[in-house]
């Protein structure tokens, strides 16, 4: 939040002087353009509500990475990565569209209503690079095959996903940037339908593939539906949102299997949900809804490619530099014992700890 306040906000929204460009900067700190009134910044919101809302989006991009590198990354290097990635990569990408940059000035402007690419794919690319350079958790992949390492509390994970679903009403609904009941209610409906359809898509595909009802796939299917609808939540109809969510949920199953096959260990499926789901949702804007068309699809492809190349290169540079200097992975003994006691000198679940 502090980084976003002092550097990132004015890097992401540098002003009209940088329209159509790939980079701009309006100075450090929070400061209104000359002559503007903070209480009348825009018809639907103020300067400071805009700041705090967008700051939460930036935080989201960083937290996406944490899931893919869980249980083996050093805390210090991860904090360093988060500061640099959110401080440099995220605002530059955001400026390309939301700050009036080159993606917004295409003949058919790139469209990303609430961040399938600008938030979720940005986090997903960082997650992919981080998981690859860290390597898998101890015992995840053996000569005998892949070993499942289940989460410690599936009911809590389920509650967490439903809390995320509820939070998405603020994520997508807030992106209307006004309290207009017609627009906000439409976004609420498309968001919820996509989430529900994502659950069904993941349930059906996982059952056909594994012959069991895999609740973890269903939970990630919900999230994939939410990520997928985020790019065009204000442009989709009822059937559009159901199709986008259903396909997104089904894609998750194949994506999780694919990344396990190439031995990229992602404990929570963050890469599949946010990167794969974000790409799908961004492309879906050119296929479904009010903006569908070849010109829009081309712009969406261009946006996905530009953001992907920049984010991959930036996250690789940061993670690789940290790996060569401070190191990014904890010692094998620390990983086996658990990061809570070694990084924080305390345990999350002391009643279940060894009494040696």
Can you name each region flagged by the protein language model?
Residues 1-356:
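Hydrophobic alpha-helical transmembrane bundles of multi-pass membrane proteins
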């Amino acid at each position: 939040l502090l980084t976003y306040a002092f550097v990132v906000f004015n890097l992401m929204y540098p002003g009209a002087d940088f329209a159509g460009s790939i980079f701009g900067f309006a100075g450090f700190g929070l400061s209104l353009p000359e002559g503007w009134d903070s209480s009348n910044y825009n018809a639907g919101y103020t300067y400071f509500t805009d700041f705090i809302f967008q700051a939460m989006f930036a935080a989201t991009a960083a937290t996406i990475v944490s899931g893919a590198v869980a249980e083996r990354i050093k805390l210090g290097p991860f904090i360093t990565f988060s500061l640099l990635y959110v401080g440099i990569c995220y605002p530059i990408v955001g400026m390309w569209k939301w700050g009036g940059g080159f993606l917004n000035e295409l003949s058919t402007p790139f469209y990303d209503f609430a961040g399938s690419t600008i938030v979720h794919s940005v986090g997903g690319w960082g997650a992919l690079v981080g998981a690859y350079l860290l390597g898998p958790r101890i015992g995840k992949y053996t000569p005998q095959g892949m070993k499942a390492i289940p989460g410690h509390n599936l009911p809590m994970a389920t509650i967490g996903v439903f809390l995320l679903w509820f939070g998405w009403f603020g994520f997508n609904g807030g992106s209307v940037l006004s309290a207009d009941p017609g627009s906000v209610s439409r976004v609420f409906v498309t968001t919820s339908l996509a989430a529900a359809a994502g659950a069904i898509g993941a349930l059906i595909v996982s059952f056909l593939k594994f012959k069991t009802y895999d609740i973890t796939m269903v939970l990630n299917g919900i999230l994939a539906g939410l990520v997928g609808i985020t790019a065009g939540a204000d442009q989709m109809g009822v059937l559009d949102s159901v199709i986008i969510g259903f396909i997104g949920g089904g894609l998750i199953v194949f994506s999780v299997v694919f990344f396990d096959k190439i031995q990229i260990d992602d404990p929570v499926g963050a890469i599949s949900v946010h990167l794969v789901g974000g790409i799908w949702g961004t492309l879906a804007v050119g296929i479904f809804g009010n903006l569908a068309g070849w010109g829009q699809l081309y712009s969406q492809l261009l946006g996905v490619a530009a953001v992907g190349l920049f984010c991959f290169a930036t996250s690789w540079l940061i993670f690789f530099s940290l790996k060569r200097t401070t190191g990014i992975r904890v010692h094998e003994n620390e990983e086996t014992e658990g990061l809570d006691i070694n990084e924080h000198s305390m345990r999350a679940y002391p009643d279940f700890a060894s009494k040696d």
